[in-house]
A protein has these predicted regions:
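Short, charged low-complexity linear segments at domain edges
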Residues: 360-391
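Accessory DNA-binding and partner-docking regions appended to nucleic-acid-acting proteins
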Residues: 2-14, 363-364, 393-610
Length: 610
């Protein structure tokens, strides 16, 4: 996983001194070299891959100040807080700052005190476009880094028009290199980023999109609250994020979980700035375990020990899903990502995008890809990385519902599909999934009897199939484009051309796969991923808990989030290796010389009871 480099390397020396890392992660060395050498570059590294380090470390080597363009105030604040705690001189400028704070930063720039300056894209567009020449003249721009660079692409999942102006601004900055960084971008988006920013002969580096430590599960929606609680029961006392589609759903679920004793806070745009900041800080400071949020939360949250992410509804693209689910397990340790989904999620997205005038062909394509992922029968890791154009060579990931044997393939999917398609046709393509399900299961409801649907040849054809399984199969046929839903607010099922062809000729459905959730054996819970089974080997759990308590106390005393002290990965290594000297402590992953000098005596006291 890590590439060893000679100790004399100045980049490695900086990595060790300020961050406590003795090795580069895949892709980091090449990305940092491009920045140090002043060559334009594009780096795509998944969340948790160490993307930010690729511009932070070179800023300490090149003379002048590095400008980092970052889309979220919370993201820049988190990164600057962490850098400052590590001894790296950094600052940010944004519209939410008090005038006095802004004046202090400007004075610090004049005095050349900083090596990194974070700004929002709005700060360098329009009237703010003079800041770049001023910075270059005042303290010398070492380079410009564009974080979350997918925002510049019309094909990206988070298009921000103001990002388009960045490329034009560099024309007045000869000799200043430009670098684009993102965690998620398809080949089409990567090409668009290069074109829009005007990158010149860029070094392009694309890391692996596979997050092997994440366990992916997809659950057809049944009883949402009960399904969420089942996941939470596996993660008592652990950090997690639950994404809901609407503010109302966020508030309702957060209140319900709080009543049940969970340490939980809501987060969405309907809260005041003060409430949002307080709730975010409570999560970062570990005074709450769970945040229930709309998707705005978490883009730059640097709490690396998130052990689960639940999507209580499908996001609008696989790019969104990969980035949001990627909030989990950023420390490289095991984490669970659960998508609870129904066909109604995609109807709702189409309605929202249509009302906003955003239902473009590109957006519809992204939505269809998300729908197919949710309905797919096969390895989730393979499906995700292949979407981003990466080959997946492992025969079995050992970290998804399919590879862990939690899904059961239907032995004759074409026959099952044709029964459902036939029922949709027989009721005249004028009824919804619930009514079609009643007909197929032979339920004599008033609606079925009054319409004479109990006399149809398809009545009772799937009497032995449960309501939940039948709805799951129907959703899969929708995702595979054999059925569509039409009408609002009560959508009806209709055959597509492909569905009609499959009804006429079973051979048209030869490649179809359908699956259902396998019922767990009595008394057995969900299986653990291989990563989880391996990550605790040799770790003294009691000692790990003592180290976490030490971290919490030190964080409170110093007024910083616990992750600034140490990440969980480092605590596990300490509880596994149990170093006995300051020299051995410096060599532990994530400690380094600076933190060993600062925190070493305290750590050794906990490890050995001194």
């Amino acid at each position: 996983l890590y590439a060893c480099v000679a100790v004399s390397d100045p980049l490695l020396d900086i990595l060790q001194r300020y961050w406590g890392y003795a090795q580069f992660r895949p892709g980091q060395r090449e990305a940092m070299d491009a920045v140090v050498q002043g060559r334009d570059s594009l780096l795509v590294l998944p969340t948790g891959g160490g993307k930010s380090l690729c511009f932070q470390a070179p800023a300490l080597i090149r003379p002048g100040v590095a400008l980092v363009i970052s889309p979220l105030i919370s993201l820049m604040k988190d990164q600057v807080d962490t850098l400052t705690a590590n001894g790296v001189p950094a600052a940010y400028l944004n519209s939410a700052m008090a005038p006095e704070d802004r004046r202090q930063v400007m004075q610090g720039l004049r005095e050349r005190r900083y090596r990194l300056l974070y700004v929002a894209p709005e700060r360098i567009a329009g009237e703010g476009s003079t800041i770049l020449p001023w910075l270059h003249e005042t303290c010398g721009l070492s380079f410009v880094a564009v974080d979350e660079a997918h925002c510049i692409s019309h094909w990206g999942h988070d298009f921000r028009p103001e990002y388009r102006q960045i490329g034009a601004l560099r024309q007045g900055l000869p000799g200043v290199s430009l670098h684009a960084f993102t965690a998620t971008a398809t080949a089409r988006v990567r090409d668009d980023i290069v074109a829009q920013l005007g990158l010149q002969d860029p070094v392009t580096l694309v890391g692996s999109f596979d997050r092997a430590n994440l366990l992916y599960r997809v659950l057809p929606r049944q009883t949402m609250r009960a399904q969420v609680r089942q996941v939470l029961a596996r993660h008592r006392g652990e950090a997690g994020i639950i994404y809901c589609p609407t503010r109302r759903e966020v508030d309702t679920l957060a209140a319900s979980l709080a009543e049940e004793g969970y340490r939980v806070r809501p987060y969405h745009a309907g809260l005041t700035d003060e409430e949002r900041h307080a709730n975010q800080d409570a999560f970062l400071n570990e005074s709450v375990d769970i945040v229930v949020a709309t998707v705005a939360f978490g883009m730059g949250i640097d709490r690396s020990d998130v052990r689960f992410v639940i999507h209580a509804g499908a996001p609008q693209s696989l790019e969104h899903y990969q980035q949001e689910a990627g909030r989990a397990g950023r420390d490289g340790l095991e984490a669970e990502c659960v998508l609870i989904v129904s066909s109604g999620d995609f109807l709702r997205w189409r309605d929202i995008l249509s009302k906003n005038g955003d239902l473009t062909e590109a957006r519809q394509g992204l939505l269809r890809d998300m729908e197919r992922y949710a309905a797919s029968v096969g390895c989730r890791h393979r499906r995700l990385v292949s979407y981003f154009g990466e080959a997946y060579s492992k025969p079995d990931c050992g970290a998804c519902d399919y590879c862990l044997g939690e899904l059961e393939s239907v032995p004759d999917p074409a026959t099952l599909a044709r029964k459902i398609l036939s029922a949709v046709a027989r009721v005249g393509q004028r009824y919804g999934a619930a009514h079609v399900g009643q007909v197929l299961r032979g339920q004599l409801s008033e609606a079925v009897r009054s319409r004479g649907h109990d006399t149809l040849s398809v009545f009772g054809l799937l009497r032995d199939v449960s309501v939940d399984d039948l709805r799951g199969y129907t959703d899969q046929l929708l995702a595979f484009g054999l059925l569509r839903q039409v009408g609002d607010p009560y959508p009806v099922l209709q055959l597509t051309d492909a569905g009609a062809a499959g009804l006429r000729d079973a051979a048209a459905l030869d490649s179809l796969s359908l699956a259902r959730q396998r019922k767990p054996e009595k008394g057995s819970g969900p299986k653990k991923s291989r990563v989880e089974a391996e990550s605790w080997v040799g770790v003294d759990r009691d000692l790990f808990d003592q180290l976490r308590a030490m971290r919490q106390r030190l964080a409170r005393e110093r007024g910083v989030p616990p992750y600034v002290i140490f990440h969980d990965t480092t605590l596990r290594e300490l509880a596994r290796l149990k170093p006995t000297s300051m020299s051995a402590l410096r060599d532990v992953y994530g400690v380094g010389a600076r933190k060993a000098d600062d925190l070493g005596p305290e750590v050794l006291r906990v490890l050995h009871g001194g």
